[in-house]
Amino acid sequence: MTSTVERGRSFDGWAAEYDRYRPTYPDALFALIAQELQLPPRPQVVDLGAGTGRASVAMATLGWQVTAVEPGGPMLDVLRSRAIRDQLEIATVQATAEATGLGAASFNLATAAQAFHWFDKPAALAEIARVVRPGGGVALFWNVREEERSAFVADYHRILERYGGAAEGKYLQAGRATGRSTTREALAAAIEFGPAQLLELHHELTATAAGFVGMAFTASYVRALDSATQERIAREEFGMVRGNKEILYRFAEPDSARKP
């Protein structure tokens, strides 16, 4: 197991916190994906690296037929509980994105929400090409903080850079740009798919002070720090927010491509 995959699997240890604090995705994102990829009504979707189902639940709520694939048992347990609570039909499979075990040409769409960077990209795209029908597509999307448009987010990143060391500084300074380029490169190299499209959909999310700090502590690069450093980060973050101030700071960024 590679270090990247191991870091991704570290989320299993805090599945409940992940589900409580991680941001959701707007309905407009899925409308945009459906339009760009010319999906049929109620498409059959495989959601890879589904986690606790932030995207799976959103798509199922829209009436999409969702199969959630997730290697982590604790994450799947939360997803299944949410599906039962919300009376949603979501099929679940405990497997990796690189080897789902699903039938060939079974889906109109494959998605990966805030997850593709954890995958073995060539292997995952080969598996996606296998399970997606001709004329179907893949959509890879992230909620991304807008540092350029938010002084609050810029301050938050400076805290992480100060306490997180070289690895976190590298992630914050270059990770998003590198992730975008490697995603597009991986899609371009996957001969089963047509040209990739990079789309941006701006949306705003709010959080209380506790919610913001809770979200920050679901990041793998924060969880990897020692407890004393985590406590210092939490104190500074609470100081930034000053009470229950609402924070608006994210947008969704999908990459999509169609299978001829």
Q: How would you name each of these model-derived features?
A:
Residues 119-127:
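A short, conserved alpha-helix within the catalytic core of class I
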Residues 1-41:
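Conserved class I S-adenosyl-L-methionine
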Residues 44-46, 52-99:
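Class I SAM-dependent methyltransferase SAM/SAH-binding core
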Residues 99-109:
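A short acidic, Gly/Pro-enriched loop at the edge of an enzyme's catalytic core
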Residues 114:
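Short catalytic micro-motifs in class I SAM-dependent methyltransferases
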Residues 42-43, 105:
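Nucleotide donor/acceptor-binding cores
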Residues 130-203:
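Conserved catalytic/acceptor-binding region of the Class I
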Residues 52, 178-260:
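Conserved Class I S-adenosyl-L-methionine
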